[in-house]
């Protein structure tokens, strides 16, 4: 699939830029409470957008840092939409923790009934790429073609009970208090809980069997789009936290190997 191969190349180039620029030092800015952005985020996004536009000038782009991409006329006219996070895990990056990545997803649109924030889309994810430059791990998938890590096919774990599983979550800047009772409930249910600080990698780690379940609130489409497809192609399940069909713009997500999914939903329903 050419568009997937192009996305893989673009993700690697962005990852190389992140490593190169990180060695030069950088200024940290705040987008909001506990929400950081660096010049490296912006440089990575600028490169990704430039490369996409050079290859696919008629495609639309939804990107984390560049607000103008949300209002392009091409959004309504484009058949394909690229959903990109140029540096997922910025706080880790800013503190020298090597758990961060580039996330790129490609959405094939059928119809759009959009508000100014484009909070409703009809279509399907056709490709997803997540590249972790510090570990040189490239996760990717295309619809109905399986999921891969550095060229090797991956699948979710076979853990059947949360008591035997390793779960993971995150605390977005605006949803910390909301997640506390869920964290407490899962802490009692799980073998252990981790908090990595990169939603895209949390999802990919489920896809390759490192984690068994994941939930988080208050996310954006660029946080989860690529990872959601990669999990599904690896045999896992992705919904919202109530077990309903995932809405990329719905902010809340529950993902698992599929075997512990119902148990996690039931745990959440008791909160």
Where are the predicted features?
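Acidic active-site catalytic centers that drive phospho-/nucleotidyl reactions
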Residues: 41, 45, 64-65, 85-88, ...
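Solvent-exposed alpha-helices and their adjacent loops that cap or buttress functional pockets
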Residues: 29, 73-76, 120-121, 140, ...
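An extended, acidic
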Residues: 155-271
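Residue-level signal for inorganic ion chemistry
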Residues: 18, 41, 52, 90, ...
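N-terminal subdomain of lithium-sensitive/metallo-dependent phosphomonoesterases centered on the IMPase/IPPase/PAP
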Residues: 1-87, 111-114, 245, 259-260, ...
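DPxDG-like acidic metal-binding loop motif
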Residues: 75-148
């Amino acid at each position: 699939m050419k568009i997937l191969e192009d996305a893989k190349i673009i993700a690697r180039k962005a990852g190389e830029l992140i490593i190169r620029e990180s060695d030069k030092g950088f200024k940290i800015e705040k987008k909001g409470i506990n929400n950081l952005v660096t010049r490296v985020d912006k440089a990575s996004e600028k490169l990704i957008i430039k490369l996409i536009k050079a290859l696919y000038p008629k495609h639309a782009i939804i990107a984390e840092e560049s607000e103008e991409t949300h209002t392009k006329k091409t959004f309504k006219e484009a058949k394909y939409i690229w959903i990109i996070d140029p540096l997922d895990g910025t706080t880790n990056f800013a503190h020298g923790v090597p758990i961060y990545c580039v996330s790129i997803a490609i959405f094939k649109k059928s119809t759009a009934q959009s508000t100014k924030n484009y909070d409703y889309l009809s279509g399907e994810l056709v490709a997803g790429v997540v590249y972790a430059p510090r570990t040189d791990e490239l996760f990717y998938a295309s619809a109905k073609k399986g999921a891969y890590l550095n060229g090797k096919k991956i699948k979710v774990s076979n853990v059947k009970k949360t008591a035997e599983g390793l779960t993971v979550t995150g605390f977005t800047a605006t949803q910390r208090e909301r997640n506390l009772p869920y964290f407490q409930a899962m802490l009692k249910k799980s073998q252990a809980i981790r908090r990595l600080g990169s939603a895209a990698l949390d999802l990919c780690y489920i896809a390759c069997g490192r984690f068994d379940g994941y939930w988080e609130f208050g996310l954006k489409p660029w946080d989860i789009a690529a990872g959601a497809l990669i999990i599904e192609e690896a045999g896992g399940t992705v919904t919202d936290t109530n077990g309903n069909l995932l809405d990329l713009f719905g902010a809340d997500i529950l993902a698992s190997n599929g075997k512990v999914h119902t148990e996690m939903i039931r745990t959440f329903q008791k909160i």
